[in-house]
């Protein structure tokens, strides 16, 4: 389905579509972004860095992308790295070289994106080790994301635009690295070697670093089809997620506008990606987590290992109060439900439909969510039980081909969140997707 050509909610068809994860990441955003990228002219990342990971299966080949938008797999697609990204250039160049096929010709990088240096990763590892000793580890990817955003907020970071003038870049680099080495008592750091690497990056990338706000807005006015790709997910948002177990950037729809420099009225459609069960990597509260054979089953059958870290993900039942909250703050128009096939073989499946206060018995107001860990401890999940199904659904091409019990599960989710589920993932590749009609 070419979503850009579809009229939504009786409004004129639009040319700007955003994809957001609705949980703690790893929902399967990469597949739907890949599917829609073949219709778009431009695919954009607006936030985050190499801590994000999209795995895309095309035939028998797997592509793991951490910085590049998924549109790089289509030759007709220009790919943009946005203002609010933090970019480790060694990782970026490795991805570009791995893909080949003149990928660089189709990439633009925001002059306002911040550069993530190796020292940021070193600091990240030091901080996580220290927190682990205190029992307060967040479970970061140690990719340097937090420290890089910290230097950005402290106004001592270096933006991509500075790399165009290498002599000026060297001065900024020396000042930043010396500052961080002194602050974190780092004795041994090879500045000369890293500067040599960055001179190579300067030569390769200087013409790819542009004012992407102007580029995107002119493209919107020219009626180009633009796909906006969210990294991480809503519940990891620095402000609206389960703080402090979050990432360091705005991952919700509000981050799009600063991340790309576009007006909110230019966004036509928001697609929320929902995994059929729930997963989380690292520390943090997880009310529906299943630390039992069910959790083990979901981990193994769903291949729930992090794209970036390869850590096994914590698994549990789908959480609808969380999903409704995320829908509320992102104005989600339609849903892509992923990995329904993983639930095949379970005798019983549960969905959390409410949070109940352990002391008062009161139910949480729909649309709200207790984001602090102490608040969440006051609640317990209220479940609705569904009968499972044994059938292999990976060859189902239409909704009506699904087992009745699987259809009932999908429709229950749709009824609760009052948002149409348009795509249903029933297997790993882009071909394993059911598309439903919607108005």
UniProtKB/Swiss-Prot annotation:
One of its GO terms (molecular function) is adenylosuccinate synthase activity. This is Adenylosuccinate synthetase. Pathway: Purine metabolism; AMP biosynthesis via de novo pathway; AMP from IMP: step 1/2. It catalyses: IMP + L-aspartate + GTP = N(6)-(1,2-dicarboxyethyl)-AMP + GDP + phosphate + 2 H(+). It comes from Plasmodium chabaudi chabaudi. GO terms for biological process: 'de novo' AMP biosynthetic process; IMP metabolic process. Belongs to the adenylosuccinate synthetase family. GTP binds at residues 25-31, 53-55, 62, 307, 313, 339-341, 425-427. Keywords: Cytoplasm, GTP-binding, Ligase, Magnesium, Metal-binding, Nucleotide-binding, Purine biosynthesis. Its EC number is 6.3.4.4. The lineage of its organism: Eukaryota, Sar, Alveolata, Apicomplexa, Aconoidasida. SUPFAM superfamilies: P-loop containing nucleoside triphosphate hydrolases.
